[in-house]
Amino acid sequence: MNSIEFPLFDRTTQNSVISTTLNDLSNWSRLSSLWPLLYGTSCCFIEFASLIGSRFDFDRYGLVPRSSPRQADLILTAGTVTMKMAPSLVRLYEQMPEPKYVIAMGACTITGGMFSTDSYSTVRGVDKLIPVDVYLPGCPPKPEAIIDAITKLRKKISREIYPDRTMSQRENRCFTTNHKFQVGHSIHTGNYDQGFLYQPTSTSEIPPETFFKYKSSVSSPELVN
């Protein structure tokens, strides 16, 4: 399925000597050693969890899930990304070593999904935060579609030139390194009347006759039982 035609093996001489470049050699070595950082926030991640089983066996592609961004070169975002989670996602992406890749999985990750119309806290597309290499639509995508997306990413890596990639990432970044988000006008300010919602009662406000009335109504046999 989606066989990868790598140019490294096309330039062979009559003496069976492979002539290639260092860039092509590094791309070839990364094809079967993608270590993903799983960033699952919603139901789309359940479909990706099916790949771990023996039916699909994503280990055959060299995928080794990592829990640390410093050991991963692929981050797979699956699910809804909220405004509160956006800085942490950008921080995880920046902690990953170069070269690094991103797969946006699911409609909620790509466009905000069903939350994009009336939700005040949903990011309308993860590509507004980090650059995306492969878009995987669906609600949710099937495991076969995830395998196809990984294969397409491997094809992209095989034809990649690293200096061109870093230059395009710098030009297409939507936020600066400091990630200072512009806070717009809020529909609801949230300034509630705290005195109306919460009125703590102290023991000094309870009349003495009320206190002794309820205390005398409880008999000793009831306390024993």
Swiss-Prot record:
<keyword id="KW-0934">Plastid</keyword>
<dbReference type="GO" id="GO:0005506">
    <property type="term" value="F:iron ion binding"/>
</dbReference>
<keyword id="KW-1278">Translocase</keyword>
<dbReference type="GO" id="GO:0019684">
    <property type="term" value="P:photosynthesis, light reaction"/>
</dbReference>
<keyword id="KW-0793">Thylakoid</keyword>
<keyword id="KW-0472">Membrane</keyword>
<feature type="binding site">
    <location>
        <position position="108"/>
    </location>
    <ligand>
        <name>[4Fe-4S] cluster</name>
    </ligand>
</feature>
<feature type="binding site">
    <location>
        <position position="43"/>
    </location>
    <ligand>
        <name>[4Fe-4S] cluster</name>
    </ligand>
</feature>
<keyword id="KW-0150">Chloroplast</keyword>
<keyword id="KW-0521">NADP</keyword>
<dbReference type="GO" id="GO:0008137">
    <property type="term" value="F:NADH dehydrogenase (ubiquinone) activity"/>
</dbReference>
<feature type="binding site">
    <location>
        <position position="44"/>
    </location>
    <ligand>
        <name>[4Fe-4S] cluster</name>
    </ligand>
</feature>
<feature type="binding site">
    <location>
        <position position="139"/>
    </location>
    <ligand>
        <name>[4Fe-4S] cluster</name>
    </ligand>
</feature>
<dbReference type="GO" id="GO:0051539">
    <property type="term" value="F:4 iron, 4 sulfur cluster binding"/>
</dbReference>
<keyword id="KW-0479">Metal-binding</keyword>
<keyword id="KW-0813">Transport</keyword>
<keyword id="KW-0004">4Fe-4S</keyword>
<dbReference type="Pfam" id="PF01058">
    <property type="entry name" value="Oxidored_q6"/>
</dbReference>
<protein>
    <recommendedName>
        <fullName>NAD(P)H-quinone oxidoreductase subunit K, chloroplastic</fullName>
        <ecNumber>7.1.1.-</ecNumber>
    </recommendedName>
</protein>
<dbReference type="GO" id="GO:0048038">
    <property type="term" value="F:quinone binding"/>
</dbReference>
<keyword id="KW-0408">Iron</keyword>
<keyword id="KW-0520">NAD</keyword>
<dbReference type="InterPro" id="IPR006137">
    <property type="entry name" value="NADH_UbQ_OxRdtase-like_20kDa"/>
</dbReference>
<keyword id="KW-0618">Plastoquinone</keyword>
<keyword id="KW-0411">Iron-sulfur</keyword>
<comment type="similarity">
    <text>Belongs to the complex I 20 kDa subunit family.</text>
</comment>
<dbReference type="GO" id="GO:0009535">
    <property type="term" value="C:chloroplast thylakoid membrane"/>
</dbReference>
<comment type="function">
    <text>NDH shuttles electrons from NAD(P)H:plastoquinone, via FMN and iron-sulfur (Fe-S) centers, to quinones in the photosynthetic chain and possibly in a chloroplast respiratory chain. The immediate electron acceptor for the enzyme in this species is believed to be plastoquinone. Couples the redox reaction to proton translocation, and thus conserves the redox energy in a proton gradient.</text>
</comment>
<dbReference type="InterPro" id="IPR006138">
    <property type="entry name" value="NADH_UQ_OxRdtase_20Kd_su"/>
</dbReference>
<keyword id="KW-0874">Quinone</keyword>
<comment type="subunit">
    <text>NDH is composed of at least 16 different subunits, 5 of which are encoded in the nucleus.</text>
</comment>
